[in-house]
């Protein structure tokens, strides 16, 4: 199924009120329309505000082919997607300030189910992050990522590594079919609760040794689970 990115663009103007005028709003409209018409975006809402929060420009549009049944205006609700990472990290820092957890705490302190996490490597022993994104950097013909092997994780995974996306988690968009398929097979989004999600994650290999490399993925999702375990409260 084709995935459509729904983008909200909110720009805050820092100009003086006396000069916050949009002289040719049609030009701005045409920029929005370009991305709607070519199918790059399903919905777009653009809003410009002055220092006092007064709207000086607002325009929205949608692709009727992609989202025929959706309406869009200033009251439309949007998923914030990865912007939720900022919220999760902010909650973590609150817990650090309150002395509830430390950035160098091992993740296994709060999620002991992760004690036996394995790392996926190729038959030559290279972590699969070396092959991610289809880069194939310095990969020989007889050195392919699939099928991968599992090796012991001898690195300590820390809370800070989750924040920095250095803990070894990933999304099913690595371009490594055997790794993407096993993650998709877990259907993480269908987890009924945090404990079930943790159990599924504990059955997946890491793409690299914690602390070895930055790799964007489910790290902040795991951070949210750490927050819950450490505080005794749910993110909801």
Feature roles, as predicted:
Residues 94-101, 227-236:
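Bacterial peptidoglycan biogenesis and beta-lactam-recognition machinery
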Residues 159-166, 219-229:
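Active-site-proximal alpha-helical segments within enzyme catalytic domains
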Residues 32, 46, 52-53, 85-88, ...:
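Residue-level preference for non-acidic, small/hydrophobic
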Residues 4-12:
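Sec-dependent N-terminal signal peptides
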Residues 22-78, 100-102, 116-123:
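Short, conserved catalytic-motif segment at the N-terminal edge
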């Amino acid at each position: 199924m084709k995935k459509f990115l729904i983008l909200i663009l909110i720009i805050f103007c820092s100009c003086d009120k006396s000069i916050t005028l949009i002289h040719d709003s049609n030009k701005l409209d045409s920029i929005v329309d370009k991305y709607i018409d070519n199918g790059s975006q399903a919905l777009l809402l653009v809003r410009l505000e002055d220092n006092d929060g007064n709207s000086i420009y607002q325009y929205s549009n949608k692709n009727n082919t992609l989202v025929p049944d959706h309406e869009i205006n200033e009251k439309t609700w949007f998923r914030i997607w990865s912007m939720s990472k900022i919220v999760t990290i902010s909650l973590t820092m609150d817990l650090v300030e309150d002395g509830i957890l430390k950035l160098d705490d091992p993740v296994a302190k709060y999620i002991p189910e992760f004690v036996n996490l394995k790392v996926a490597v190729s038959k030559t022993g290279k972590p699969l992050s070396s092959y991610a994104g289809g880069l194939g950097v310095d990969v020989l013909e007889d050195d392919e990522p699939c099928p991968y092997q599992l090796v012991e994780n001898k690195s300590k995974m820390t809370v800070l590594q989750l924040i920095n996306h250095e803990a070894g988690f990933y999304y099913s968009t690595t371009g490594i079919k055997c790794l993407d398929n096993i993650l998709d097979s877990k259907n993480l989004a269908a987890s009924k609760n945090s404990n079930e999600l943790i159990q599924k994650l504990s059955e997946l290999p890491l793409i690299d040794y914690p602390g070895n490399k930055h790799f964007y993925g489910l790290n902040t999702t795991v951070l949210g689970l750490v927050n819950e375990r450490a505080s005794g409260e749910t993110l909801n």
